[in-house]
Design a protein with these regions (language model features):
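A surface-exposed partner-binding patch
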Residues: 1-102, 137-138
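Short, surface-exposed beta-strand/loop "edge" segments at domain boundaries and coil↔beta transitions
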Residues: 65-66, 100-104, 118-125
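Low-complexity, compositionally biased segments
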Residues: 70, 104, 129-131
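Short acidic-glycine loop/turn motifs at beta-strand connectors
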Residues: 106-108
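Short, compact, well-ordered microdomains
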Residues: 112-113
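Compact, glycine/acidic-enriched structural inserts
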Residues: 120-138
Length: 138
């Protein structure tokens, strides 16, 4: 993890869940196959979920400030799949923007954002680029 993310966790521990075990991460990998990038797995070991800047980062654990019903990567991904906003099995919802649009890990490790208008845009090359952007925006 980059030092600025570690500094945020040290300064605002209530914004970060505890890291999770490799067995918990493996359960996620088993369900979502190629969508759980190595960078995202590294983040989950550091924090099972977080709020960085104004963005939730969904993991396998919840942060108290998150929505009580949609607060883990599995719950949020299932919600957007069920709503038909993302194609089932192709994306992993790791965050949402201020309009409630999903921000997802793609099969190639890039991070894409979907709009309610049906558009998909690749915004970051990888997960670390996304969380660095979140930290810089805070």
């Amino acid at each position: 993890m980059k030092s600025n993310i570690i500094d945020l966790k040290n300064s605002y521990p209530f914004m970060f869940a505890e890291g999770v075990s490799q067995s918990e991460i493996q359960k996620l990998v088993d369900v979502y196959h190629g969508l759980v990038s190595s960078q995202y797995q590294e983040f989950l070991k550091f924090s099972g979920g977080a709020i960085i800047g104004a963005y939730p980062l969904y993991g396998v654990s919840s942060v108290e400030l998150m929505d009580a019903h949609f607060n883990t990567v599995s719950k949020v991904t299932n919600k957007y799949e069920d709503d038909g906003m993302i194609e089932k099995g192709r994306f992993l919802v790791i965050s949402e923007n201020h309009a409630g649009d999903p921000i997802c890990l793609n099969m190639d490790g890039s991070v894409v954002e979907f709009s309610h208008d049906g558009f998909q845009e690749k915004l970051w090359e990888d997960f670390n680029g996304f969380i660095e952007w979140c930290a810089d925006a805070s």
